[in-house]
């Protein structure tokens, strides 16, 4: 591909560190999980995700995103999401989630698998949005 280097799909002169800084600075809540580890734990989250959920990195890393679920989280949507992730497929939907302080928010999420060259899922990347105002209408 013209303008790309190292076969990694990065434009010439753009480093992984540049992407990491951009993701960290983004106002869009983002999280990465590792399905190769037991219970698919969070391995990275940006500042916007921490602000949305109220968790600090050390409280979140190593834990499954289930910690955002609560008694009013829709079990049917969860089942659909989990089936997609088990199959290595993308998922898009909304869930009622719970912040660390127990308050609820509607979480609109898009989850995509990140694969290696052989097609194996290495990570799941999720971009999220607070959809609470939409649900108040």
Description of each model-found segment:
Residues 46-49:
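N-terminal capping loop/helix in small sensory signaling domains highlighted by a polar->aromatic N-x2-3-F motif
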Residues 52-56, 61-66, 71-73, 79-81, ...:
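PAS-family sensory domain signature
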Residues 135-137:
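Sensory-domain boundary/capping and coupling elements
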Residues 13-23, 98:
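Short alpha-helical capping/linker elements at sensor-output junctions, especially the PAS-family N-cap
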Residues 29, 43, 91-96, 101-110, ...:
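PAS/PAC sensory module
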Residues 32-41:
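Short acidic/glycine-rich beta-turn/loop cap or linker motifs at sensory/regulatory domain boundaries
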Residues 2-6, 21, 25-28, 35, 90, 120-133:
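PAS-family sensory domains
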